[in-house]
């Protein structure tokens, strides 16, 4: 029940709005005719009176018309008779001249109104015909129930400027505009008579009852503008999102470049400054590391008695006696082996595979010195025992019973430490605590010469051990481990005079410089150079 009532109210409101639109359209067309043809001004008054009188009552009190889609406006002819007369005879539709049909279009600003609506009428079909100045058939002038006798003694309003002169009866029948015609007594807009707009086609439909199908034609320009606005808003939204993403990407890229350049700057400049400022602090902290702790001394568990003291002293004396005997025996055997003619004391090169381009080092040694023995060992998998066995085997191959006079250890490392094997770093603290490292250096000392009048030399290349005070401590601890053999350790800078002398002792200096220049290069294979 409520839905039906609301539906009827909606239909009534639509009907009233349609009636108001027709009245506004009638007045607009009348003003258009008055401006275009000043002599036909009475035609506009008749048109307004007809439109208003047809819809004077409310839509509820009027009977439903036969055709809701008829605008009931006539273009050819003038009104005859009073507005209150009812035609008694209705002729068939086929008789008499064909009326023109006017449609409502939404062109802007031809009729000012409070709702800013502008509605005008456009002639869409009909033929211009001349009719005699006699009374014609009566036509229905309004769908509201009142019928008028309309005659066509005049020519078309839009086609001739002489309608009112030829038909003076039309001027007598024209009533003045009433002030209750929905406020349509406003002054007409000035419009050039020669300027006429082409209007899009649209039919005005009165929707009052449900038995009439709805066939509304929306104006083409309004539909197009609506679609264009929607598409434009979507395009603007998409473009804004795309522009925002591009802006964020540019900002992120610029921030990444700035951060990368800043990190590079810190590596090139700031790191050196920080290193200079914190060198003393890092040196102090190095002594507090676990591997830098001094070796704890074992507690003396022996009884504090004279017997135990005498036993220890006698044991030490016996060990020293055996060591002296072994020392003398080994020294005599080495002297006998070195007495042969043409004997050259051997120089052993211990090369770690961790050194870049280490496989080319045996090819750049001095070719005029056959006493140089290169030994390349695997940094990842070799052990201290493997290295010692390889040194003994190469010495026996070179000359049986020969010992090392000079030795070069070419490996990676740094100030204060020596990187001999994987997970085996020689530092001044570790050579005192780790058993395998202590055993390696002691066995290596037994392979050094005992008949050399000068101390045996072990050169360190590939790193600068003495760049840190811990390097001197490391050398001192190694010398202590290798006693009673006289061994000295040297690690000069390669660009110094001592460094050049060390290089010339083992390498061809020209080939060594060439190898050094290609050591970290991937552009040229060293085999091609050699």
From Swiss-Prot:
Region called Necessary and sufficient to elicit dendritic processes and synaptic contacts, residue ranges: 2-233
Single GO MF descriptor: calcium-dependent protein binding
Name of protein: NMDA receptor synaptonuclear signaling and neuronal migration factor
Modified residues (Phosphoserine): 204, 290, 292
Alphabetical keyword list: Cell membrane, Cell projection, Cytoplasm, Cytoskeleton, Disease variant, Hypogonadotropic hypogonadism, Kallmann syndrome, Lipoprotein, Membrane, Myristate, Nucleus, Phosphoprotein, Synapse, Synaptosome
Record's subcellular location: Nucleus; Nucleus envelope; Nucleus membrane; Nucleus matrix
Effect of residue 196 to H: In HH9; phenotype consistent with Kallmann syndrome; the patient also carries a mutation in FGFR1
């Amino acid at each position: 029940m409520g839905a039906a009532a609301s539906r009827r109210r909606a239909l009534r409101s639509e009907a009233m709005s349609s009636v108001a639109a027709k009245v506004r359209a009638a007045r607009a067309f009348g003003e258009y005719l008055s401006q275009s043809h000043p002599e036909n001004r009475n035609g506009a008054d008749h048109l307004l009176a007809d439109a208003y009188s047809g819809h004077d009552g409310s839509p509820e009190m009027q009977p439903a018309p036969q055709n809701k889609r008829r605008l009931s406006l006539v273009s050819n002819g003038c009104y005859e008779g009073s507005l209150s007369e009812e035609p008694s005879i209705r002729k068939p539709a086929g008789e008499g001249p064909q009326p023109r049909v006017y449609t409502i279009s939404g062109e802007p600003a031809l009729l000012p109104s409070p709702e800013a609506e502008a509605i005008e009428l456009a002639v869409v079909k009909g033929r211009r015909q001349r009719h005699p100045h006699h009374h014609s058939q009566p036509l229905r002038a309004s769908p509201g129930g009142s019928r008028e006798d309309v005659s066509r003694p005049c020519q078309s309003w839009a086609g001739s400027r002489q309608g009112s002169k030829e038909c003076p009866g039309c001027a007598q029948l024209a009533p003045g505009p009433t002030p209750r015609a929905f406020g349509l007594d406003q002054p007409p807009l000035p419009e050039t008579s020669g300027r006429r707009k082409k209007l899009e086609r649209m039919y005005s439909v009165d929707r009052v009852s449900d038995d009439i199908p709805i066939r509304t034609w929306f104006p083409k320009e309004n539909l197009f503008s609506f679609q264009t606005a929607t598409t434009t808003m979507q395009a603007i939204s998409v473009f804004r999102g795309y522009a925002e993403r591009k802006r964020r990407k540019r900002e992120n890229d610029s921030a990444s470049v700035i951060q990368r350049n800043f990190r590079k700057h810190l590596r090139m400049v700031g790191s050196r400054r920080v290193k200079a400022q914190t060198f003393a602090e890092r040196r102090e902290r190095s002594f507090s590391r676990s591997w830098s702790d001094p070796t704890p001394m074992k507690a003396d568990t022996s009884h504090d008695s004279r017997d135990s003291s005498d036993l220890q002293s006698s044991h030490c004396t016996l060990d020293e006696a055996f060591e002296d005997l072994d020392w003398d025996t080994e020294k005599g055997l080495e002297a006998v082996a070195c007495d042969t003619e043409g004997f050259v004391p051997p120089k052993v090169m211990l090369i770690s595979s961790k050194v870049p381009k280490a496989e080319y080092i045996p090819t750049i040694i001095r070719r005029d010195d056959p006493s140089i023995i290169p030994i390349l060992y695997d940094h990842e998998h070799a052990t201290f025992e493997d290295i010692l066995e390889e040194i003994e085997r190469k010495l026996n191959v070179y000359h049986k019973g020969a010992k090392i006079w000079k030795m070069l250890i070419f490996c990676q490392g740094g100030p204060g430490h020596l990187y001999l094997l994987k997970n085996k770093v020689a530092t001044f603290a570790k050579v005192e605590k780790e058993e395998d490292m202590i055993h390696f250096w002691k066995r290596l000392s037994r392979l050094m010469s005992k008949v050399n009048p000068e101390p045996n030399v072990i050169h360190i290349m590939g790193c600068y051990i003495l760049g840190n005070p811990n390097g001197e401590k490391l050398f001192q601890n190694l010398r202590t481990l290798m006693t009673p053999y006289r061994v000295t350790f040297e690690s000069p800078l390669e660009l110094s005079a001592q460094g050049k002398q060390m290089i010339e002792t083992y390498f061809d200096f020209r080939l060594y410089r060439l190898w050094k220049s290609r050591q970290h290069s991937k552009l040229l294979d060293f085999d091609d150079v050699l």
